[in-house]
Design a protein with these regions (language model features):
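Membrane-water interface segments at the C-terminal ends of transmembrane alpha-helices
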Residues: 19-54, 70-186, 210-234, 239-241, ...
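The alpha-helix within a helix-turn-helix
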Residues: 196
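Short cytosolic juxtamembrane segments of multi-pass membrane proteins
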Residues: 286-294
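Polytopic alpha-helical membrane proteins, predominantly small-molecule transporters/carriers
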Residues: 57-58, 200-202, 207
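Short, Lys/Arg-rich, polar N-terminal cytosolic tail immediately upstream
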Residues: 1-19
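Short glycine/proline-centered loop/turn elements that form peptide/ligand docking sites
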Residues: 188-192, 292
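Glycine/proline-centered hinge or cleavage motifs at structural transition points of membrane proteins
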Residues: 199-200, 213
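Short hydrophobic, aromatic-rich alpha-helical segments embedded in or entering the lipid bilayer
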Residues: 55-69, 144, 243-255
Length: 294
């Protein structure tokens, strides 16, 4: 009896200690890792580039400010956000029915669908991008099929423009959204849908009032992931886009490799990092609201 009482008291003390631990402390190792991997190298890059210029900080900042407010940078920022938004919306339209089909599949069908989604990630992104360049070229598969069907009289220009960038980026980023939506849809209790149908609700009404609201958290999370990855994309826009499709990552590469303007490149890198942190803060706030609302 005494041993049982001591063990029970020990469990209660252990439980109190566990409750007393702030969950924020559990994130400290991850935050330290992120600071060392992302923030510290960017800051080092910025201050080291300032030291190599031999100019004072105010002089460099004035020069950078004049460049940042130039039409080139402004157009790149607008273009980056616009392409990222279009890619996110197109990926959502394609990913939602795919994720829904996966959530309703079982056995071999589900396994094959997951393999088709994940398998491309075992191939280099450069190889996948070049594959799409071959498919979308003037003599590529798409134009050949359309010409054979008589739908077009001359090959379409699907490469080296915004359309090519959107197609290539959507293909690369689509699995992120599909898997996020699949996880969200898989957690929905099917009994809710059966109950709605048994009470006389139509399939469309059940989807609109029950199924879709329950998947909005996954939609928001997946779209945020795709948008964040899109704003920092480099390889696909560089290979499949044209001169008018200059994105922020491509400008950073140009400033580092061609003009050797490292301070400006580091400022734009910090700008990208700030956008990412803001978007993650929005997602964190949204997640907390979802938990509070049940």
């Amino acid at each position: 009896m005494v041993d049982a009482a001591v063990m029970s008291r020990g469990r209660k003390v252990g439980a109190k200690r566990q409750k007393a631990v702030d969950p924020g402390f559990l994130l400290l190792p991850l935050l330290v890792l992120l600071l060392l991997v992302f923030v510290a190298p960017t800051l080092w890059f910025f201050f080291n580039s300032l030291r190599e210029t031999g100019q004072s900080l105010p002089e460099v900042m004035r020069a950078i400010q004049s460049v940042l407010f130039s039409s080139t940078i402004r157009d790149a920022i607008i273009k980056t956000n616009w392409i990222s938004l279009v890619v996110t919306l197109v990926a959502l339209v394609i990913a939602y029915p795919i994720a829904y089909a996966m959530s309703r599949s079982r056995g071999l069908a589900l396994t094959l669908m997951v393999i088709c989604i994940v398998l491309p990630y075992f191939t280099s992104i450069i190889v996948r991008t070049y594959s799409w360049m071959v498919i979308l070229g003037r003599n590529g598969l798409v134009n050949e099929v359309l010409l054979q069907l008589g739908l077009i009289s001359s090959p379409l220009q699907l490469m080296y423009n915004t359309s090519g960038v959107v197609i290539g980026m959507t293909y690369v980023l689509l699995p992120y959204l599909v898997l996020t939506l699949y996880a969200s849809m898989k957690s929905i209790d099917d009994r809710l849908l059966h109950a709605a149908r048994s009470l006389g609700a139509s399939g469309f009404y059940t989807f609109r009032r029950i199924y879709l609201p329950l998947t909005l958290h996954g939609v928001f999370s997946g779209c945020l992931i795709v948008f964040i990855l899109s704003i920092g994309f480099f390889i696909t826009p560089a290979l499949m886009g044209g001169p008018q499709d200059m994105m922020i990552a491509m400008l950073i590469e140009r400033e580092v490799e061609l003009t050797l303007n490292w301070p400006l490149a580091s400022i734009m890198s910090l700008f990208l990092l700030a956008i990412t942190l803001v978007l993650y803060a929005v997602y964190y706030r949204f997640s907390n609201l979802q938990k509070m609302m049940g």
